[in-house]
Amino acid sequence: MDMKTTGDDGYFVEERSAETVIARMRDCDDPRLKEIMAVVTRKLHEAVKEIEPTEEEWMKAIHFLTEVGQICNEWRQEWILFSDILGVSMLVDAINHRKPSGASESTVLGPFHVADAPEMPMGANICLDGKGEDMLVTGRILDTDGVPVAGARIDVWQANDEGFYDVQQKGIQPDFNLRGVFVTGEDGRYWFRAAKPKYYPIPDDGPVGQLLRAMGRHPYRPAHLHYIVSAEGFTTLVTHIFDPDDPYIRSDAVFGVKESLLADFQRVEDAQRAQELGFANGWFWSVDHDFVLAR
């Protein structure tokens, strides 16, 4: 084998730059790390050769990556945000959560899940401050054969009508506002009351936000409800449901929307039913959506 072809001679030549770097990993005793770094090295060198950046452009890229790291802290992960806006987070999620035919699709978890949300009786209202447009959420948890799943744990959370989660507005929203955990009975059905969520921006006051603006992109996520659905014997489902009429439904900043996750948000003009549900405005939003769990 020609050492010049494989890069094993150790000398740097532009035409075989990636091969020279990859050859230095011959003594790596972690095969997975070796595989990953070989692919990353090859693709990065391919990109640099295609782009042919100036030295000034390369230093600008280095400074951007430095700023991304510097803004991270215990509650802010700008690297994840960077991955999100490039669609990489969704791609990793899709690869790791491929579903059998008929099972509900997953999407990214998001940064605002709270592990100790309270378990609530079926039908409870998770909107604790009474603000926003009333909403009734119903549906079933099924297996891929259409059989109801009893004992399914449904962890749900959402932003309020101004686009904020409770953890973003300590002292303004009550703790655990618009969060709750529900457990299905034998019929697999769930229902709860809430407030219609609104679209909101991802954090855009840092380097990732600057990059979005430079690319001519907005920072908004369309209105959605988060779900984690788990049951014994089934794969846990992390997903959302989205309002198809949201202005940002086709341009989610983090690419989290899949067509199967669109739900039907219906405005119900029924004063009697609204009163029965404890809604004071004489009308409400209704959304019915089933989730299908895979084993």
From Swiss-Prot:
Its cofactor is Fe(3+). Gene3D superfamilies: Aromatic compound dioxygenase. This is Hydroxyquinol 1,2-dioxygenase. GO terms for molecular function: catechol 1,2-dioxygenase activity; ferric iron binding. It catalyses: benzene-1,2,4-triol + O2 = maleylacetate + 2 H(+). Belongs to the intradiol ring-cleavage dioxygenase family. Induction: Induced in the presence of gamma-resorcylate. Binds 1 Fe(3+) ion per subunit. The keyword Zinc-finger does not apply. Its EC number is 1.13.11.37. The gene is graB. Pathway: Aromatic compound metabolism. GO terms for biological process: catechol-containing compound metabolic process. Keywords: Dioxygenase, Iron, Metal-binding, Oxidoreductase. Pfam families: Dioxygenase_C, Dioxygenase_N. The keyword Nucleus does not apply. InterPro entries: 1_2-HQD/HQD (IPR039390), Catechol_dOase_N (IPR007535), Intradiol_dOase_C (IPR000627), Intradiol_dOase_core (IPR015889), Intradiol_RC_Dioxygenase (IPR050770). Involved in the gamma-resorcylate (2,6-dihydroxybenzoate) catabolism. Catalyzes the conversion of hydroxyquinol to malelylacetate. It is an enzyme of class 1 (oxidoreductase). Fe cation binds at residues 165, 200, 224, 226. The lineage of its organism: Bacteria, Pseudomonadati, Pseudomonadota, Alphaproteobacteria, Hyphomicrobiales.
